[in-house]
């Protein structure tokens, strides 16, 4: 023993230990080894390579599905794994025992079969046992009778279905039908369907992971696929910013490249809400009298549209105010009358709309009831006195402008003992809408679109007329090349190679003055 003998002992798992000891080494050699050895699970058919439903086996220990092996034997007459002769009457029907969790187990020891279990089958009965049970209770005691049925058997009737020390039988790469690719189109289709399951590609999976995935398969409900429609922006719903697809396609590797920017499309609600300029007015006719309400539609459009639509379609008709608290508020809007129901016109809760200038500072404030942030539905309440502590917790969208006497009469009603339910029911018999700015905004949008369509069609017609005039005034081409629009006969003849013969004058010779002594005339 030397000094510092443990100085290299780490308190963590090193990379080399993880690869070598942990069995996670992944290099060319291990990848080649995995490619050469692909193990088939014990619960899979050796022919279809899929989980079996009616298992049978050959004397050599290969397990098949009865519906897969019988047609194969009729066609080929040999073992699809070894190539040796095999007929259907030589197949042995296997009887697997299952536990409460649905997994195969030994019917004697009750131990679940795993990839490392030594599994045997008795040919005379077809029962499947663990090697331990047969070794201890049959072979050592020389009691060669089936442990469940007492059917006699010999040692030759013991078939090795799985031996963890000899797994060559489960190597799919060595199966004859895999090597020769003796698969039918139906088998290939089944394999392709199995490959669609993500679990097909999982190399290792413990029992806990298997149970979780099985539970997920039972409870998982896929979402309905929705196809995105590429809306085209017009002059009304076009935003002042783009869709951002060019930048996303340039910076993201998962998006297709886009080279042209398009304006973002505003949703229909945003377009309509921008054209709402005046408040709405609604009357709730109760069995104690009317309640006239003013709704702040330009400031709180979502809550106001939700309330007005429910009033228009009769959603609030014959509903009760289910909650009454003196000196606090009167709550209603639930068709069930329990305080737990009611939906918005969008069939889902909508977000809060808090306006800084609005407050629960007076009697008769109309506000949305909710179960928390952004959970507004159809329920609303009217205050009996100022409740400023409700500010920025509930959306204020209106106020009482008529029917104070009715509200006072309702406030004086007694409630059931221990509850806030009025002893005398307060019922909304009907709701009347006097002014609906959202309907007017919708008509305005439709009118603007019709005007734009009319203008567009008019511009298109004028452009077509302009092109027609240009085509009519354009001279007709009489040829090609330079001067193709010239209609003179000479030009035409010139282009056609028919120039008239024009007499040419003889070229005059140029006289040059001579230098020097030509004669003696001037002497």
Curated annotation (Swiss-Prot):
GO cellular component assignments: catalytic step 2 spliceosome
EC number of this enzyme: 2.3.2.27, 5.2.1.8
Tissue: Exclusively in the larval body wall striated muscle cells.
Keyword vocabulary terms for this entry: Developmental protein, Differentiation, Isomerase, Nucleus, Rotamase, Sexual differentiation, Transferase, Ubl conjugation pathway
Main localization category: nucleus
GO molecular function annotation: peptidyl-prolyl cis-trans isomerase activity; ubiquitin protein ligase activity
Family annotation (Gene3D superfamilies): Cyclophilin-like (2.40.100.10), Zinc/RING finger domain, C3HC4 (zinc finger) (3.30.40.10)
Record PROSITE patterns: CSA_PPIASE_1, CSA_PPIASE_2, U_BOX
The reaction(s) this protein catalyses: [protein]-peptidylproline (omega=180) = [protein]-peptidylproline (omega=0); S-ubiquitinyl-[E2 ubiquitin-conjugating enzyme]-L-cysteine + [acceptor protein]-L-lysine = [E2 ubiquitin-conjugating enzyme]-L-cysteine + N(6)-ubiquitinyl-[acceptor protein]-L-lysine
Similarity comment: family membership: Belongs to the cyclophilin-type PPIase family. PPIL2 subfamily.
Name listed for the protein in its UniProt record: Peptidyl-prolyl cis-trans isomerase 4
Species whose genome carries this gene: Caenorhabditis elegans
